[in-house]
Amino acid sequence: MNTQSKVYRTGEEIYDNLPCDSYFNMNAIRNLGIPTTFPTIGTFTLDSTTLGLQPQGQGPSPQQQQHQQQQQQQQQQHQQNMHHHQHQQQHMQQQQQQQQHQQQHQQQQHQQQQQHQQQQQQQQQHPTIGMFDANEVNDVIQNPPQIGVFQSNSVLTNGAGSGSSIFGSQSSNSSAAAADPSQTTRETGIIEKLLHSYGFIQCCERQARLFFHFSQFSGNIDHLKIGDPVEFEMTYDRRTGKPIASQVSKIAPEVVLSEERVTGTVTTELRTDSANNVLNSSETTGRISYENRGECFFLPYTKDDVEGNVNLRAGDKVSFQIATNQRGNLGACHIRLENPAQPVKYRGVVCSMKESFGFIERADVVKEIFFHFSEAEGNVELRPGDDVEFTIQTRSSASVPPQGREFACNITRLAPGSVIFEDVDSTVYKGQVLKSLDRNNPVRQNNDPLPGRIRYRALDYSEVEVPFGDKDQKGDFTLRHGDWVQFLLATDRRDQLQRATSIALLDETFKVSGEKREQGTIASLKEGFGFLRCVERQARLFFHFTEVLDTSREIDINDEVEFTVIQEPGLAYNNSRLQAIRIKHLPPNSVQFETLVASNIEGCVTREAPKSPIKSQDRVEGGVITYEHADVKKTIMYFLKDCEKPPRIGERVRFDIYMVKRNKECIAVNVQQVSLHQQQQQQQQQLHLNQSNAGANINQNDQLGGLSNGISSSSSNASLQNGYVMHGSPGGSTSSVGSNNPVHLDEFKMENNNHAGSDAGQVYRGFIAVMKENFGFIETLSHDEEVFFHFSNYMGNPNWLELGQEVEYTLARNGNTSVSGNCLPAENVRMLPKNSIPQPAVLETTHNGVVARPLRCINPDQQEYAGLIEILDELRTTVISQHEFGITSLVNKRDLLQKGDLVSFRIDESGRAACVNAVRQKKRATVDSIKGQFGFLNFEVEDGKKLFFHMSEVQGNTVALHPGDTVEFSVVTNQRNGKSSACNVLKINDRPDRLISRLKLNGDDTVPRLILIRAPKGPQGKGFSVLARHPRIPGNLVE
C-alpha cells in the first residue's frame, strides 16, 4: 500500500512537471470505444489510453497478442448476442413485414463486418504498449521524459516524431483540424466584451472585431474575462457570411507582472567597464535574492530592468516586481534602489491634473506615477507641462485598493526644458505612408498611441518601418496610404523606441498617385472653417483650417489654392457633404476661372443684356451677340459687367471669347463698341484742332465737362451733360437740367453714365438711394439705374450720409464687379451741398394715384429701376396717366412704397412724380419692448405675433421712447417674404409712472390684500452646523 501510494505520488509529480504544448479532443477518444475498467495498479495496462504511440520498429510480445485476441473475441460475442436478441423480437412483432426484416438483417450483418474490420485495423495501427508492474516504477522515475520507448510529450503533441494521427482514421474533421494546426492560420486577440452566451474579440494583428460564441471556447467559460489574450481561427458564418472567430483558446500573456512589489538584495551585480562605463558582454545579467515563506530565491535581471539610471552594487537593498515570461521563467523588473538616507531622485513632467491629485510622466521609464498636491514642497503650484523632480515611496493601506501603490513625494519644480524624453535627429528622411491615422475612430487610437506607420530606406539601404502618432504631423491634414512624406526621427531615451515626427507632405505625392486636384479661391472664412469658390464647381466647398498644408502661412480671403474633394467622413452617404482636404497654396494669378478661346471677334448685338441678370433653372441669362466664325453664324452670351458701355440692339461690337470652366460655356468678355471707338478717335482729333485754333472761345477744360454743375457744351453734334452723351442738342446752345423750358429735356436721349466711354477721371453726380451695413447704391441723374459704392470709397464719415443726399463720384472702369453685380462700382464718392444739383420745377396741383411699380431696391427682380405711379379714373379701371418716380421724389426717403399703395403726389416740369407721400391708415398701440436698434409693439399680426419696428422708423427723439408709451404708426407688409413691420412711428404720450405697479394690485378695496413686509432669504450655502450632526436622545429637547 505504501509502495502504491509512493508510486502514485511520484507519477503525479511526473505528470505535473511534464510540459504541455497542445491539447487533445476528449470526444474523439470517447468515440474509439475505450473500456472504462482497468486492472489493478500492480499490473495495469496503457493499451487504450496511449493508442499505440510505440515506434513501428518494435512489435508486440506473444503474451500481449494473446490477451488482445481474448478481449476481441469477448466483445464480438457480446455484440452478436445483443443483435440476435433484437432480431428475435423484431421477427415476432413484424411477421407481416418479412421482406423488410430480411433487408434490415442484411444491413446489420454488413455493419457488423465493417465494425469488425475497423477494429482489426485499429489493432494493427495502434498495438498496445505493454504491461507494467510496480517494480518497473523506479526505472520510470529515473528517466521521466520516456515511458517505455516513447516521449511523454508525444501524448499531447500528436506523436512528435511520427506522422500518424493520434486519433486514427476514424477521427472527425474538426478533431483532425485541431490536430494539424498547419491547415488553418491561428490569430491572437484580446477579449473585448462578454455577454450571456457570446462575446467579441479585438484582433491584435489587424483592426478587426470578431464575434464568437461560447460554444467555440475550449475550456471553462467562467474563467474567461475581459482583457484575456486568446488564440482563434477566423471563419465565416454560414447564414450571414460575416467573419467570426472559432476554436477560441486562452493563451498566456507574454509577461505577467506581480501586483505587489518585493524587497530583496543584490547578490550579483552587472559587470561594467569602469573606464567607459560600458556593460561587459560576458556578464549581461545580475541576480537578486529575496525570501518567501522562509525560502530564499534568486532572480535574474538586466540593465533595462533598473529604474532611475543608477548602478546597483552587491548588497544594495532594492524593491522590484516579479515578471513571468511566456516560457514560465521568473525574473526581476522595475528594480528600484531603496536608500532611506539618500533616496534616489527621479525626474518627469506633469502630464495631467485633477481636483487634488495628478500624474507625472517619468523620464526614466515609460510609465506614469500618481502624486497628491500636498506632496509639492513649499507653495509651488504645479501645472500640466511643468518639469519636476521627485522621490518614490510605496505605501500600503486599506483605503488604497492596489496594495503597494507607488506615490511621488518631495516634488520640486525644475527649470523648463530640464526633462528631455527624446532626441530628434536633424537628418531629413523621405518615406512612404503604410498606415494612416484613423481620425474617425479615436477609440482604436487609444489602444496604440502610435498607430501610424511609415516605411523608408535607411543609410544601409534596408527597408525600415517607424510608427507615428496624431501629434507628429506639421498640421492635422489628412494623410493617406501611399503618400510620400519627409520627416525626422525621434528616439525615446527611455526605451530607445524610434518614431517619425515633423511629418510634411511632399508635392511628389500628387504627381505619383494621380490624385485628382482642383483649384479655387477662398471665398469666406469663419471660426475654424471656411468655404472655397471652385473653378469647376458651381457650389461653394467647405473646408477646415486644419487641412491647410502650410501651417506657417495665414489664410486670407481670395487666396488661390489647390485641393482634393472627398465626401465628409463619418456620416451616411445621403447626409454627407463634400469637403476639401490637403489644401495647398498657389502663387498669385495661378487660378483661372475662364480660359481664353479667341480674341478680337466682331459681331452684332441681337439682344440687350438686362440691367439685373435673370436666373432661370440655375442659369443666368444675359445679352446675346451674333457673329460669324468659319462662315457659320453663331451666338454668344454677354453681361454688362464685361462691357465698357452697354451696347444697344444692332450695334457692332468687338469682344473676346472665354470659356467658363465650371459649366464649359462660352461668354463674350471685353465687349467694345466699334462705332464708339471710332467716334472717340474723331472727337480726339476734333479736340486737337480746337486747341490749335486761336480764335476758339472754349478752352479744353470746358470741353471735358469742367463746369460747376457738371454740364458742358461744344459745337460738336454730341455734347456731354453731367456725364451723359446728349444727342440732337442744338448747335452752339447751352442746356441745363434746371431750365424752365421742358422741351430741351425731351429732345435729348440720355445714355447710361455707368459705362460711358469717357476718361476714367470723369466726375458724375447722383443721389444716395439705398444704404446697407457697409455699402450702398447711388441713383444716377437720369433716375433709370443705380451705381454700387462701398463705404471704403466714401471720402468722409459714412455715418453722416442720408437717403437722397447729393454726391459726386467717379467710376472704376475695371473694378471688382463680384460684389457690385453687373454695374461698375463708384469710387471717390464725395458729399455735395444741398441743392447743388438743380431739379425741375414742381407744379402745384396735387394728384392721387396708385403705385404700379416700386423702386428696384424694393423688388430686385424687376428690370426697370424707376418706380411708376398711375392716375386712375373714378372707377379705378382706366389709367389716365403714368409718372415715374425715384428716391428724390419721396417726401419721406425711408418710406418703402410697394405695389398697390395709395399715394398723393405732384408732377414736375419733366413729367416725373414729385413730393410723393404715402396715404396709409394710422394705427395706435403701446410699445411692448425695445431691444437695441429694434423693438415690438402690442399690435398682433401674423398669427398672434407682435409687430416689429426699427428705431430708424421712429420720428423725433428715439431716446425718449420707452416700453409702455403710446405711439401712432402705419403697417407695411413686405410682398417678397410676407412679413409686416411698422413705419412712421410717432410717439403720442408717455407711459403712466406707476402703470406696472397698479396693474399688479387688485382694484377692489373691499377684499383683503397681501402685503409683503419682509423679503425671504435664500440658503447660505455653508451646510448644516456641527451641532446638527450630533446624535440626540428621542424625547429630550436640547437647548
From Swiss-Prot:
Gene3D superfamilies in UniProt: Nucleic acid-binding proteins
Q: Which GO CC terms are listed, alphabetically?
A: cytosol
UniProt record, GO biological process: cell differentiation; dosage compensation complex assembly; negative regulation of translational initiation; sex differentiation
> Where does the CSD domain start and stop, copy by copy?
186-250, 261-337, 345-413, 428-503, 517-585, 593-673, 763-831, 846-919, 922-987
Q: Where is the composition biased (Polar residues)?
A: 49-62
- One GO MF term: lncRNA binding
What the record says about family reads:
Belongs to the UNR family.
Question: Can you quote the domain comment?
Answer: Composed of 5 canonical CSD domains that mediate RNA-binding as well as 4 degenerate CSD domains (non-canonical) that do not bind RNA. Interactions between canonical and non-canonical CSD domains mediate RNA tertiary structure specificity by reducing the conformational heterogeneity. The CSD domain 1 mediates association with the 3'-UTR of msl-2 transcripts. CSD domains 7-9 at the C-terminus bind to poly(A) sequences of RNAS.
- Spell out the PANTHER family in the cross-references: COLD SHOCK DOMAIN-CONTAINING PROTEIN E1 (PTHR12913:SF1), UNR PROTEIN N-RAS UPSTREAM GENE PROTEIN (PTHR12913)
Name of protein: RNA-binding protein Unr
What does the record give as the organism's lineage? Eukaryota, Metazoa, Ecdysozoa, Arthropoda, Hexapoda
